[in-house]
Amino acid sequence: MSQSPQTVDQAISVKTDYEDNQQEHIPSNFEIFRRINALLDNSLEANNVSCSQSQSQQQQQQTQQQQQQQQQQQQQQHLQQVQQQQLLKQQQQQAQQQQIQQQLLQQQQQKQQLQQQQQQEQLQQQQLQLQQQLQQQLQHIQKEPSSHTYTPGPSPELQSVLNYANVPLSKSAAFNCNNSSSYSVGPTPVQSPVTPSPAASAVTVNSPSYGNFQLFGENAFDSTTPFQSDGTSQSHSRSLANDSDPMVVMSPGRDSIIPLSPTEKILYQNFLLSKQAQGENTALPPSPPHEIMPLSPLEKKLYSNLLSKHTQGMRAINSTSPLQTPLTPPRSPQEVLYASMPAAQVGESSSVIDMMSRMDLSGRNQQADYSGTLAFLDAHNVLRRRTPSSSRSRSVMERSAPSSYFANLDPYAIDRAARLHRNAAAVGEASCTWSGHLPPRNHENPVYSPKVFLGGVPWDITESGLQAAFSKYGHLKIEWPGKDGYVHLLFDVEKSVRSLLQACTHDFSNGDYFYKISSRRMRSKEVQVIPWVLADSNHVFQPSQRLESNKTVFVGALHGMITAEALGRIMSDLFGNVVYAGIDTDKHKYPIGSGRVTFSSRKSYMKAVQAAFVEIKTPKFTKKLQVDPYLGDAICSLCNSHQGNYFCRDLLCFKYLCRSCWYWQHAPDSMRQHRPLTRNTKSSLSL
């Protein structure tokens, strides 16, 4: 099929038009480069803008950080200033408190001084009054030997003794309606001049003279030797005296002399001195039977009631005395008062009276000497009642001590010595040593004490810092024992202790617990946490054995790592036959540094007591323990009437004693070095 020429021409024209149009729309290379450069310039400008913006932002951030740092520094400086101010305030408060305490102490000292001065003045007045009364009575007796004159009313001392003896005033021969001013004590026998014996020598108190009369001596109340010096038997004299005086009350026994108070002694001796002024004398042999003068009704009633008031106590003492002697026939009061005594006893009693006569008016020292001397005399009376008459002279001579020992005696020296002995482990020498490893602590589901020990505490730690560190485990209190480096944490419940131990680092090789705390100077410091398992407080080695207190020793100065089992093992290795061991604890069931060990044999017990100090050596520590007899409640072994608050651990004594008997027992020079023990009631626990 053929095309026409017109059609071809049209097609060619269309093609050329299209090509022309395409060339017009396609840009040239220059235009393309220009556009690319424009785009690059735009991108560079954008980049420059963004860089400048980022730099400005960084600068702003840096300035902000600098400002923040400056603010923090300012805050720290402010805090430091506040802390310094607080420290200054605390120091000022402490200084003020110290000043207040010093002022209070000064006021207390002034009050005590005033009280002491008042007491001294009262004592001086009382002594002066007593001396004046005694002088007046003696002068009155010397002036009127045939009668004893009384005032219309009784003196205060006479009235007190009459009330004590239950003697009504209406029955007194000195104060009746028929004779209200004086009464006669009996016929006046003819008196021959006789030189007094050394046993009845005069006693002087500064200027007053007391003749053959002793203030607080017991010579007038002793009957250990025969009364007569002319061969007349004492029993015959007693029978005649009792026949002529049916109102005489029987004495409880030969050696059980009834102790009287000082006022009773003075009054009763003054009664009988009236008879002495009429012809009787302690150094004279007794008069014939028909010349023995009867007692007045007042004397009979007084002596009878005094005997009845003391008989019950004396029976109890005599019933427990292993040296009790058989009862003797009854004696009259004259024989009881004027019986003679061996020379050794007279000399000793005279020395005591001399010591009493030299008492000064120096306040507290005088009062202590006075009370100590009375206690010594009471103990001396008790010992004389317990000692047989055949060996009494030898016993007194062996135990005799110079009067200066009792005159200069400090009644509180024994208490100070006992307190010093409690800390004797620091200076004592160990007699034996134990070396080894402590038994391991293996407990399943242990129960702890709510009290925990912290060791190695930073020196600058405060209570608030400790509260902040440990309050997360439970409510607690901080106890500062007073030494740097350790404290006690006291939680309310045992569960808090468990939580604390779980947060601690546990050294399984040694069983130690460590906890990290921070202070102002130390950011991280490990302190040792030492809990106490309640099962470690007691350990029984022989369950079938009975625990006896007389085979138990007290062990002091224990280390905190020593358990009851460890203590028992140590004592068993050293002395053997351990039955039980226990650790003493406080009210929170935490150890207080002492324990008890009970033995099954007396031999092991005595070996432990004789050791006194034991040194313990372990890989962790070395410690010296103090071993003493375990003390309980006991009666004095000598008088059997007072509480035995002191124990002599020396093997020559080894018994409980009261204060008076202790001084009397240890009067010889060879026994003054014995060490006293007292019971510490705060820490001692009964078995």
From Swiss-Prot:
Compositional bias annotation for Polar residues: 147-159, 221-242
Localization terms from the record: Synapse, Synaptosome; Cytoplasmic granule
InterPro entries: CEBP1_N, CEBP_ZZ, CEBP_ZZ_sf, CPEB, CPEB1_RRM1, Nucleotide-bd_a/b_plait_sf, RBD_domain_sf, RRM_dom
RRM domain segment(s): 450-529, 551-628
Annotated function: Sequence-specific RNA-binding protein that regulates mRNA cytoplasmic polyadenylation and translation initiation. In its amyloid-like oligomeric form, acts as a translational activator. Up-regulated at activated synapses where it is required for the late phase of memory-related long-term synaptic facilitation. Sustained CPEB-mediated protein synthesis for at least 72 hours after neuronal stimulation is required for the persistance of synaptic facilitation. Activates translation of atypical protein kinase C.
Protein name, as recorded: Cytoplasmic polyadenylation element-binding protein
Segments for region (Disordered): 139-159, 221-246
Alphabetic keyword roster: Activator, Amyloid, Coiled coil, Repeat, RNA-binding, Synapse, Synaptosome, Translation regulation
Gene3D superfamilies associated with the record: 3.30.70.330, Cytoplasmic polyadenylation element-binding protein, ZZ domain
Subunit relationships: Exists in 2 different conformational states, a soluble alpha-helix-rich form and an insoluble beta-sheet-rich amyloid form. Stable self-sustaining active amyloid-like oligomers are formed upon neuronal stimulation and contribute to long-term facilitation in sensory neurons. More than 80% of the soluble form is found in high molecular weight oligomers, the majority of which have the size of a decamer or larger oligomer. The insoluble form binds RNA with significantly greater affinity than the soluble form.
Induction description: By neuronal stimulation with serotonin (at protein level). MicroRNA-22 (miR-22) binds to the 3'-UTR of CPEB mRNA and inhibits its translation while serotonin triggers down-regulation of miR22, thereby up-regulating CPEB expression.
PROSITE patterns: RRM
